[in-house]
UniProtKB/Swiss-Prot annotation:
It comes from the Bacteria. SUPFAM superfamilies: Actin-like ATPase domain, Heat shock protein 70kD (HSP70), C-terminal subdomain, Heat shock protein 70kD (HSP70), peptide-binding domain. This is Chaperone protein DnaK. The modification Phosphothreonine is found at T173. Residues 598-607 have a biased composition (Acidic residues). Acts as a chaperone. Residues 581-591 have a biased composition (Low complexity). Transmembrane segments: none annotated. The keyword Cytoplasm does not apply. Belongs to the heat shock protein 70 family. Gene3D superfamilies: 1.20.1270.10, 3.30.420.40, Actin, Chain A, domain 4, Substrate Binding Domain Of DNAk, Chain A, domain 1. The keyword ATP-binding applies.
Amino acid sequence: MSKIIGIDLGTTNSAVAVLEGTESKIIANPEGNRTTPSVVSFKNGEIIVGDAAKRQAVTNPDTVISIKSKMGTSEKVSANGKEYTPQEISAMILQYLKGYAEDYLGEKVTKAVITVPAYFNDAQRQATKDAGKIAGLEVERIVNEPTAAALAYGLDKTDKEEKILVFDLGGGTFDVSILELGDGVFDVLSTAGDNKLGGDDFDQKIIDHLVAEFKKENGIDLSTDKMAMQRLKDAAEKAKKDLSGVTSTQISLPFITAGEAGPLHLEMTLTRAKFDDLTRDLVERTKVPVRQALSDAGLSLSEIDEVILVGGSTRIPAVVEAVKAETGKEPNKSVNPDEVVAMGAAIQGGVITGDVKDVVLLDVTPLSLGIETMGGVFTKLIDRNTTIPTSKSQVFSTAADNQPAVDIHVLQGERPMAADNKTLGRFQLTDIPAAPRGIPQIEVTFDIDKNGIVSVKAKDLGTQKEQTIVIQSNSGLTDEEIDRMMKDAEANAEADKKRKEEVDLRNEVDQAIFATEKTIKETEGKGFDAERDAAQAALDDLKKAQEDNNLDDMKTKLEALNEKAQGLAVKLYEQAAAAQQAQEGAEGAQATGNAGDDVVDGEFTEK
């Protein structure tokens, strides 16, 4: 069975891992980095992903960041003169990860386990699955990020029973999950979180502070300058990371803008104490889900054996201190917070292929599911933290006499009134026989699969007529749209491949021309006229093909030049080797002669 890769599709950074033997291994990207920025930019028709895209974010307005925060919404982003759905942008990131995983493995990759925040709702999960499909991946499983982290942490501890709290603060989302580990079973007891809290918010606090201070000093509002704001974002992210290791950092942005007197520079010192003060409310917000998860699991702090930190934002000292204060425990630092989620996803891939045995993952649904009933009330059918997959049915009836149809309004959330919860979808069961209110028996069944994706069925028990939908939110894509996007993605991948091959060829041609010209110059007057003339002719042919911009001709002429240049290089090498041998022979003869000169006659007198 082919490998199933594990992907952590993050807000700020993403990572890909694969199971090798019994160990999960992070695959480095083409730049040698173990995580890849979740950044996509467009330039001259080319799609650029990762480190290269992030580097040009300041100067390229067609750059998209933090797209994960828009997953599951109908919001689109404009770039490259087009509008893209969040699924399409995410697919570009997934395609890039898939591509370099294939280069590493030396084989095609078609299957993946992709992680999502535990608190992602159905629409966000479905959007993630769609993104995988557009990228040419069969998504074998959607796994909650804290659960994946627990898998990576606990795989070698299956003989030990313990309860762990996973504190996952990423770039844009925050989750807390409590799991019970023992005998190879990873049982999620509860999960809680905040999908609007992450490292981006900490960056924004620094940005707001810098904008306010600069305005106070110079009377200019930088928030209206798009390029200045991108520079501020990069500086804020760097300052945040610096302050995890030092107590003070210098922010220096020369020529940030221009005033009446000329260019203006931003120079500011940010201390860790000031950063902690700016972000105090964000750190406080992390405490509520911790308490909620403990309460839902029915556990006290003393029953938690280990606290695992996941996500780059858990490196912030104030966050670490808050976790210590809230749990009363020193966090376990045996896992890399940036890599552990992808590693866990790869392990889940191994469970699916059968390479990892005796491991069972029992995950939960993060939010309650139900329907709207009379009076706009939210009636729950499946409570949050129910182990999935699961199915639950309940019988309802009509609200009016001779009602011919019922509207099923499917919701997800915890609020008592339907209007305050997230609408997942609506559908209608029709042709209900005329009867007084309360008589028809309408059975509503909710099914949640192993990926946390919901389907709902309504059945008239009198006529046995039923209607089923797999929930598709307002932001959902139709099969036709996904197919079109898949074709676009494949076409882009092919175009990108051709473009890369073209660039590689041009680089090879430039290198060959430079090297051959150098060799021809070095061999001047050394008696290789025939070889030099042949190399020069091949060189002229290649230069002509380069001028004509004929790629096929360039490829042919490059091969011809390499052959002629190699012949010339061999002659040069042979001559150099012969000269070396001659020199060594001369030195040897001289040494022998000198040895004879050193012999002198001696006179001895007997006593």
